């Protein structure tokens, strides 16, 4: 049986791929592996961006493997512990200080949307994507942060529309409501995600982390608290070798070459 969890690094960009065709259901141990590996990935100074995708071009993920949930709950000791682990993994992605990019193609349902919601960039295929949180049709609710993160990304009205009606949207509608930052042809999707990761990898590391910390953090803070975070970010990055290089490059009308400080 093929390993449903694939990991690789190319040009400072780490890629996690679900590999369980055709629907790429996320097995219980996929999350176990992410929880084990993400701390090392996020602390590695040579990894400057992360891409979450899936093998092939059929589907990103149709969600969690529901048949494995009872086994996962038994191993975790309780439903609360089982889902707490999943929230820990998404919190690491969202708050880890490394830009995370997700790809939407084919089915992106349930956990196949909730994991990307913890990422900082989402790119969709221009054809064939079916994105949604269908838990209402199962008599349940999103269990992996979907009802908390989706309204922060697209607003309350669109989130209620998608969740209460279990409505699936395509890539173009996802772009219109702000769920994704861009839409590209399916055959270009993975290359575009890699290219974006490589572009982000050239940016000054401390400044990237400071911006992520400030913008992600502002969603749960007051304006005054967020401004204080920004002040601290400015103080931490101003005067670093990379900021000096950026200023010099601007004045000399050339492209900066950062040393990743």
Predicted regions located by residue number:
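CoA-thioester-processing core
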Residues: 89, 93, 103-104, 109-163, ...
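Acidic, divalent-metal-coordinating active-site segment for phosphoryl/phosphodiester hydrolysis
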Residues: 110, 166-173
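Conserved CoA-thioester-binding segment of acyl-CoA-metabolizing enzymes
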Residues: 1-53, 91
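Terminal low-complexity tails and localization/encapsulation signals of metabolic enzymes
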Residues: 1-2, 248-261
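C-terminal long alpha-helix characteristic of the crotonase
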Residues: 124-129, 180-228, 235-236, 241, ...
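Glycine- (often His-adjacent) and acidic-residue-rich active-site loop
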Residues: 54-92, 108, 222
């Amino acid at each position: 049986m093929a390993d449903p969890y694939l990991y690789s690094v190319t040009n400072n960009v780490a890629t996690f791929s679900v590999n369980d065709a055709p629907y790429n259901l996320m097995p219980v141990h996929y999350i176990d592996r992410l929880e084990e590996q993400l701390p090392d990935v996020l602390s590695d100074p040579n990894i400057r961006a992360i891409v979450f995708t899936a093998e092939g071009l059929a589907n990103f993920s149709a969600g969690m493997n529901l048949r494995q949930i009872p086994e996962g709950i038994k191993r975790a000791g309780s439903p609360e512990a089982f889902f707490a682990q999943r929230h820990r993994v998404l919190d690491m992605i969202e708050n880890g200080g490394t830009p995370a990019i997700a790809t939407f193609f084919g089915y992106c349902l349930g956990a196949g949307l909730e994991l990307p919601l913890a990422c900082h960039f989402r790119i969709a295929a221009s054809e064939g994507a079916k994105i949604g949180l269908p838990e209402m049709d199962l008599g349940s609710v999103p269990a992996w942060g979907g009802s908390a993160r989706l309204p922060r990304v697209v607003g309350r009205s669109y989130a209620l529309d998608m969740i209460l009606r279990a409505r699936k949207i395509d890539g173009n509608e996802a772009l219109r409501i702000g769920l994704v930052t861009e839409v590209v042809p399916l055959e270009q999707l993975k290359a575009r995600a890699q290219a974006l990761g490589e572009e982000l990898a050239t940016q000054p590391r401390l400044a990237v982390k400071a911006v992520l910390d400030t913008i992600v953090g502002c969603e749960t803070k007051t304006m005054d608290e967020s401004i204080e975070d920004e002040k601290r970010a400015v103080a931490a990055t101003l005067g670093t070798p990379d900021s000096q290089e950026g200023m010099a490059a601007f004045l000399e009308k050339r492209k900066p070459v950062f040393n990743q400080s």
